[in-house]
Amino acid sequence: MAALLDEREVEVGEMNTWNELIALVDGWAESRGIYNASNPQAQLLKAVSEMGELCDAEVKGLADDAKDGVGDVLVCLIIYCGMKNWSIRQCLDMAYTEIKDRKGRMLQGGVFVKEN
């Protein structure tokens, strides 16, 4: 997937738009050879590892680490989507379209379960 923005075009730490962030992650992965040397399965395994770190941060009440964990999982998923020539935005839109009218119930412990 070709980078839409050069990493140097955006100041570090400034709030970027969704599209800028996707392009920056894409360019970062491209410049480090991830698209050429890795594969979708490896990116999913990395995402699972990052999800474990996110869960660990949540359990320990480490808010900054949890935010970083969410970002790390998203980076892996953006790269995964890039390898599949998918738009992560389209994937999210597809998922929302599927759940938006979903009915279900809340289980004890706060998990929403869809109706059959």
Outline where the language-model segments fall.
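Flexible "arm" and connector segments at domain edges
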Residues: 2-70, 74-116
